[in-house]
């Protein structure tokens, strides 16, 4: 499972997030997406931990918590469903 962390301060770093989530267990990975054109952080992150129970505890404790002056939104990440092709090239039944 992957955790979505939204409403992040643009000052937050991978090390900052690892430190916060380490209180709930071992952090496997942190991803901080950046804007392709500006290189600026986009204000959200994805965190993976070793065990689902650890992730559940982190979500319960951190969702709505204030951190770096922002109220965090923390929940289970949803799989991306768009395939970025639009309708062109999709097989359709006629």
From Swiss-Prot:
Ranges of biased composition (kind: Basic and acidic residues): 78-94
Alphabetical keyword list: RNA-binding
Molecular function terms, GO-annotated: RNA binding
One Pfam family named in its UniProt record: RRM_1
Record bears the keyword Mitochondrion: no
Region Disordered, annotated ranges: 73-94
Signal peptide residues on this chain, from the entry's feature table: none
Limits of the RRM domain: 2-79
InterPro entries: Nucleotide-bd_a/b_plait_sf, RBD_domain_sf, RRM_dom, SLIRP/GR-RBP-like
Protein name (database record): Putative RNA-binding protein RbpD
